[in-house]
Amino acid sequence: MSTEKIADEIKFAYWVPNVSGGLVTSDIEQRTGWDFEYNKRLARTAENNGFEYALSQVRYEASYGAEFQHESTSFSLALLGATERLKLIAAVHPGLWHPAVLAKFGATADILSGGRFAVNVVSGWFKDEFTHLGEPWLEHDE
C-alpha cells in the first residue's frame, strides 16, 4: 500500500465549541469561545486547512462548567451557512426528538447545505437533562 493512498483516506474533524466553559469533564480549567462569531471563524479556519467534518455536541444543562449551550442542530445549520465545504454533524438525543421531526429537519438541512449535514445519535449521560425535560431516564444497560 502506498503512502499516498493512506493520506487520501485520512479525514479530519473537530468538536464545535457550542457550549460555554469547556468541551469535556475535567478538573483542568478550560476556556473556549462559544459564541457564533468565534465559531464562524473557527469553522472557516478548519475548512481552509483541510478539515472535512465538525461535530456539534448536544447539551441542555451541564455540570462541568458548560453553563450555557447552543442547540446543536440549529447551530450546525448556521455554521453550514457560513462555510462552503465543511460537513456538520449535529449530536441529538433520540428521546428528545420525534423521529419524523428530526428526519424532516435533517433532510431540509442537508438540501439547504448541498449534502453537508449529518446526525450523530447519542444516548446521553446527564440524567437531569432527560428528567428535567419530562423524559424517562433509562439506565444504560436497559
Where are these regions (language model features)?
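Hydrophobic residues within beta-strands of alpha/beta enzymes
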Residues: A54, L88, F117-V119
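Conserved catalytic cysteine-centered active-site region
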Residues: A82-A90
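N-terminal beta1-alpha1-beta2 module of alpha/beta enzyme domains
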Residues: M1-A82
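Short linear capping/connector segments at secondary-structure termini
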Residues: Q57-E61, V92-H93, G134
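Glycine-rich "substrate-gating" loop/helix at the edge of Rossmann-like oxidoreductase active sites
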Residues: S63-E67, H93-H98
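Active-site-proximal glycine-rich helix-loop-beta segment
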Residues: G50, E84, S113-G115
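Flexible, glycine-rich active-site loops centered on histidine and acidic residues
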Residues: A7-G33, G95-E142
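Short, well-ordered alpha-helical packing segments
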Residues: K40-A43, L77-L80, H93, A103-D110
